[in-house]
Amino acid sequence: MIDKPINRCPMEQNTEKFSIPNSQFSILTSYFPDLTDRQKEQYAALYDLYTDWNAKINVISRKDIENLYPHHVLHSLGITDMLRFKPGSSVMDLGTGGGFPGIPLAILFPETHFHLVDSIGKKIKVGQAVAEAIGLENVSFRHCRGEEEKQLFDFVVSRAVMPLADLVKIVRKNIKKEQINALPNGLICLKGGELAHEILPFRNQAISMDLKDHFKEEFFETKKVVYVPL
């Protein structure tokens, strides 16, 4: 079990040393033009790190690794369409896999703590190694099932892990009562396809937003971000 902060690891301010395709990185910076040099450095490092780790432990479809930034990093940041976390917030990423959406969000919100949870230990190993390599100081990891995690958080985020009703059952226990953000504490998840039936039990509470309204790439045509207050 891994349940500890990541050690600091300083990085040089030079994105040119990474083999990231320029077209991919320009997609990211076009939507997030206010990134600091530090954040650009951290995002740029993800390409080589995930390419290397993915050859050993499959956390991203090997056919899709070339689309790391639009399909995984930018998609993770689609959470910001619903909410930008205030400093001091705490967020659990349930079913993080190799670190999505938690690691891209942790880079963007350095004053928010992200706790990344997954039931598959080797995937947690990848996420931890990536976080250590880029010097993320605001993340912790735990190898466990969501039902086993008892800590409290302002929000839980998730990316296409399971049906909405199942997610709500698991994470309701993890939501703090005290609120500091613009939205009441709850669940924010990234979903795809037709969600009318899935959202039906929460129709009086849930908010669903189409990512295609913010991101112009074809990949986002059917992608949504869904919020349920808990």
From Swiss-Prot:
InterPro entries: rRNA_ssu_MeTfrase_G (IPR003682), SAM-dependent_MTases_sf (IPR029063). Its main location: cytoplasm. CDD domains: AdoMet_MTases (cd02440). GO terms for cellular component: cytosol. SUPFAM superfamilies: S-adenosyl-L-methionine-dependent methyltransferases (SSF53335). It is found in: Cytoplasm. NCBIfam families: rsmG_gidB. This is Ribosomal RNA small subunit methyltransferase G. It comes from Parabacteroides distasonis (strain ATCC 8503 / DSM 20701 / CIP 104284 / JCM 5825 / NCTC 11152). The gene is rsmG.
